[in-house]
Amino acid sequence: MTDYQSKYSLYKRKYLSLKQKQNGGNNTADNTADNIDPIVKKFVDSIKDAKPVYEVTPEEARKNLNSIQSDQSYKTTVDMENVVVNDKNVNATIIRPKGNRDRLPVVFYVHGAGWVMGGLQTHGRFVSEIVNKANVTVIFVNYSLAPEKKFPTQIVECYDALVYFYSNAQRYNLDFNNIIVVGDSVGGNMATVLAMLTREKTGPRFKYQILLYPVISAAMNTQSYQTFENGPWLSKKSMEWFYEQYTEPNQNLMIPSISPINATDRSIQYLPPTLLVVDENDVLRDEGEAYAHRLSNLGVPTKSVRVLGTIHDFMLLNPLVKSPATKLTLEIVVNEIKRITTPNKN
């Protein structure tokens, strides 16, 4: 058992023991209110009267998430370089440790937030922590948002950016022999689709993929979708709305580039080793774990972690930065990046 697995197991045991004690020895696994950390509960309570995304416009949804993320007090100092990818009008940002121009390992980061929201304003703190704690360069793709641009635009733009930086690795001093793809939520969806595309198109290969509470299937028929249909935070109706914004009305949502769980065995067998993280109180929990099982069963070295006491987007949300789940999972992610990108540490 690795060090992070030991720490996670210890946290898991302590948290369950605490909940059992509070509930007279009964573990109320189906009671979401009893299964979230106090910091998380405070955040959930603070937004309980806010309109859900499916009752506002995409622009309002973006403003609302930006407002939640407005506390930048935890943002760490980094250097950023904005790049326009060839003639594709795709914007990306290279993020490095402050003052460090060394040829560092690369994390190709694909952000989440429902394909509709998100960018450096929402993800800046999180990716900056990865940059500084793992000592890597992050390539952050500012892909076009839905519904202004529909599927597959976002995936195409991310792939174009990947190929561009691979072709210009020397110019930007990037170690493309040491590249990991990381994505959260819908970014996790696109990250694993990108990993499949690199094989199909013989593009640059990822050494590893880290998928954080990823969107894996549009079927929306798992037990966790039933248990957490109304949240907290992410609900079934919200996911339905996100898919509506992302795709055209007659789009088949079951194709692998939208629902990666449906990829062929061959496509999955060639995926890179994987760390997949899900959270306890999340409609996406079960599909993420089902994907981890499928990868593992098809021979892909896979680590799957379920983090207790928290909600979807917990790594992203600035109000949750001090929660035990966020701190521990950041440590897991950073340690895994270091293990993969540091010579003789694999």
UniProtKB/Swiss-Prot annotation:
The keyword Ion transport does not apply. PANTHER family: AB HYDROLASE SUPERFAMILY PROTEIN C4A8.06C (PTHR48081), ALPHA_BETA HYDROLASE FOLD-3 DOMAIN-CONTAINING PROTEIN-RELATED (PTHR48081:SF8). Keywords: Hydrolase, Virion. The keyword Acetylation does not apply. InterPro entries: AB_hydrolase_3, AB_hydrolase_fold, GDXG_lipolytic_enzyme. This is Putative alpha/beta hydrolase R526. It is an enzyme of class 3 (hydrolase). One of its GO terms (cellular component) is virion component. It comes from Acanthamoeba polyphaga mimivirus (APMV). It is found in: Virion.
